[in-house]
Amino acid sequence: MLTQGEGVAINTEYVVSDTMRFDALARDILLGRARTTGRQLIEACLRLDELYTGPLYVPNFGDTSFYVRQRRLYQTKFVDCMMRGAHVALELDDLPVASWLIDAALRQAPLREDVIRAAMHIYDKGGRRREVVELYNSHVHVLEQELHSLPERETQMAYEAIIHGDREVELLA
C-alpha cells in the first residue's frame, strides 16, 4: 500500500487486480495496437469477456456516485470492446465468434442502437433472420412502451434493408 496525504493506493509492482487486467485488455483492444492481428484482438476480447463478470457492485449506503460512474464506465468499455471484436470477427468471416461477442454486448447494453444494428447485421449474415425480426420488434416495443420513443433512423433503415433484402442499402453497423 502506498499513502500520500490522505490518499491510499496499491503499488502495482506487487499487486495486480481484475480491474487492472480489465483496463489493460480494454486499452489494447480499443486502441488497436499496430502489431496486433485480428485473431489476437479476438482472443483479447474473449479473455475480456471471461474476465468481466457483470456490472460493478454499487454499495447501498453513503455516497455511491463514484461507484455508479465506475459501473457505467466499465460497462461502456466492455460493450465497446465486444463491438470492436465482433467487427474484426466479421472481417475475418468468423460468424460464430462475431455472434458470441455481439450477444455479450447485447446482454450489457440491450438498448444501445449501434449494438442493435451490429447484432441485426451479424444475425442476417448467419442466416438468422427470425432473430433479426425478434430483436428489432422487441427493441421497438421497449422504446415505444417504456421510453415513448422510436428507433434511430439508421436502425430502421438497417432493419428494412435486411427484411426487404435490399443489399444496395448500406447496413450501418
Predicted segment positions?
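Intrinsically disordered, charged and Pro/Gly-enriched terminal/linker segments
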Residues: M1-A173
